[in-house]
């Protein structure tokens, strides 16, 4: 299963990466984005898995795009749709 493979890969690197790029967002962000857009939130297995990663993983910035917007949701989560975001300048000052 892909999620188990992901966990095993992250175990090998001590749960530390520079950046995360996914289509979907972790559950808490997904729920807020659905609410803001007047959509029903249906929390699914992938969103819960991404929430697990978000809680455990050390990273500089997380980029996702499912919700068709362009904004920083907080200091490490960037919704990307049309913007071009140079990764070198992403989340300046954030550390893992």
Language model: regions and residue ranges:
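Extended recognition/assembly regions associated with phosphoester-bond processing machinery
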Residues: 1-96
């Amino acid at each position: 299963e892909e999620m188990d493979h992901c966990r095993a890969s992250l175990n090998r690197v001590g749960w530390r990466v520079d950046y995360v790029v996914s289509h979907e967002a972790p559950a808490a962000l997904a729920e807020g984005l659905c609410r803001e857009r007047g959509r029903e939130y249906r929390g699914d297995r992938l969103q819960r898995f991404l929430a697990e990663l978000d809680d455990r993983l050390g990273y500089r910035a997380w980029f996702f795009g499912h919700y068709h917007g362009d904004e920083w949701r907080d200091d490490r989560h960037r919704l990307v749709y049309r913007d071009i975001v140079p990764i070198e300048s992403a989340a300046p000052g954030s550390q893992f």
